[in-house]
């Protein structure tokens, strides 16, 4: 099976290693000249994933036309705010064939439109089936070959099941789901909740308080799922893309969102911490859009609201933590 990965950040690079090690023919594309040079010359992404060798069988491209010529599937591994730009680059290359499955790995919301990643891609490529690959997968562990499980969601459930089986390997289990929207809601909101969890940890408020954040966070995820699609699927809420990814992102030292929050909690202010994080912090990028979506859906999202106002300088860190912990732990989690 030949696959193309568009985007050579930490996750895209780790995915190229994992898929190559399961016998896939892998191409990886990047518009970053430094990354391309590092991969070609040293077999390593020294910018985003230093210390991990990329198999020489992985073909590295900077030409979109060559990268997207004839793969069985394309995995889009760029930040949510760069997704539409990536689609425009693909369109300009005129190489994408109709019917080729597009697997979106972005976790976020497009700020300008409040659209989820699958909606952006489906709008740009109506002739291609769109899926979302998500779940608890730290890049360094994925690249190391440690056990990992993810979910592939899409409206075309039979194709999703086939792709999940084809992409799986001994250390990488991929299951399929028909809940395209629910999986994406969990993917974006868990990053925001992880920032809150990190703040609580950084302030030294204890594990009990962290548990409050995660439960309240699950309640907010459930509320958005219900408002968007009318129902929150139990298998999604307690599955890999929501509960699984939430727990990982809120607790793992390698989680950028939790680490960012912890730095904020320790520093007592948000400004300086952001300058210490050169890597993308997805929750920071998406929280304002998530608050705006909540308003449009007439929802109260206390964690999202507190984090957004804190990042915009409208709320101090201690006040944000107090609001988060005083938010009523909803009883909506009847799963």
Swiss-Prot record:
Per UniProt, the enzyme's principal EC class comes to: oxidoreductase
Q: Name one Pfam family in it.
A: NAD_Gly3P_dh_N
- Its signal peptide is none
Asked if the record carries the keyword Cytoplasm, the reply is yes
Its pathway, per UniProt, is: Membrane lipid metabolism; glycerophospholipid metabolism
The active site consists of 190 (proton acceptor)
Q: Which GO terms describe its molecular function?
A: glycerol-3-phosphate dehydrogenase [NAD(P)+] activity; NAD binding
Q: Which keywords fit this entry according to its UniProt record?
A: Cytoplasm, Lipid biosynthesis, Lipid metabolism, NAD, NADP, Nucleotide-binding, Oxidoreductase, Phospholipid biosynthesis, Phospholipid metabolism
Question: Where does this protein reside within or beyond the cell?
Answer: Cytoplasm
Its GO biological process annotations read: carbohydrate metabolic process; glycerol-3-phosphate biosynthetic process; glycerol-3-phosphate catabolic process; glycerophospholipid metabolic process; phospholipid biosynthetic process
EC no. given is 1.1.1.94
TM helices/strands, residue ranges: none
Q: Which residues bind sn-glycerol 3-phosphate?
A: 107, 135, 190, 245, 255-257
Per the record, the similarity remark reads: Belongs to the NAD-dependent glycerol-3-phosphate dehydrogenase family.
UniProt function note: Catalyzes the reduction of the glycolytic intermediate dihydroxyacetone phosphate (DHAP) to sn-glycerol 3-phosphate (G3P), the key precursor for phospholipid synthesis.
Q: What is this protein called?
A: Glycerol-3-phosphate dehydrogenase [NAD(P)+]
High-level lineage: Bacteria, Pseudomonadati, Pseudomonadota, Alphaproteobacteria, Rickettsiales
Name the gene behind this protein: gpsA
């Amino acid at each position: 099976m030949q696959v193309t990965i568009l985007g050579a950040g930490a996750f895209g690079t780790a995915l190229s290693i994992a898929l190559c090690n399961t016998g896939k023919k892998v191409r990886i594309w990047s518009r970053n000249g430094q990354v391309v040079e590092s991969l070609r010359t040293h077999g390593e992404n020294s910018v985003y994933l230093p210390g991990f060798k990329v198999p020489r069988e992985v073909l590295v491209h900077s030409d979109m036309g060559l990268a997207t010529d004839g793969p069985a599937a394309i995995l889009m591994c760029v930040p949510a705010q760069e997704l539409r730009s990536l689609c425009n680059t693909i369109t300009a290359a005129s190489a994408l064939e109709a019917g080729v499955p597009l697997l979106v790995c972005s976790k976020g919301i497009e700020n300008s439109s409040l659209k989820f990643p699958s909606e952006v891609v489906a709008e740009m490529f109506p002739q291609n089936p769109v899926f979302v690959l998500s779940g608890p997968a730290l890049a360094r562990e994925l690249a190391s070959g440690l056990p990992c499980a993810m979910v592939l969601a899409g409206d075309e459930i039979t194709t999703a099941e086939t792709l999940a089986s084809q992409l799986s390997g001994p250390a990488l289990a991929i299951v399929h789901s028909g809940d395209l929207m629910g999986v994406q809601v969990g993917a974006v909101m868990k990053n925001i909740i992880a920032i809150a969890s990190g703040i609580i940890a950084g302030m030294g408020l204890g594990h009990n308080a962290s548990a409050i954040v995660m439960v309240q966070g699950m309640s907010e995820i459930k509320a958005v799922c219900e408002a968007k699609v009318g129902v929150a699927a139990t298998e999604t809420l307690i599955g890999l893309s929501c509960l699984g990814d939430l727990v990982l992102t809120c607790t793992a030292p390698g989680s950028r969102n939790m680490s960012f929050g912890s730095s904020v909690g320790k520093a007592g202010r948000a400004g300086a911490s952001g300058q210490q994080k050169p890597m993308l912090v997805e929750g920071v990028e998406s929280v304002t859009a998530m608050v705006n979506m909540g308003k449009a859906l007439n929802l109260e999202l206390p964690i999202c609201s507190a984090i957004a106002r804190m990042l915009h300088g409208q709320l101090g860190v201690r006040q944000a933590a107090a609001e988060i912990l005083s938010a009523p732990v909803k009883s909506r989690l009847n799963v």
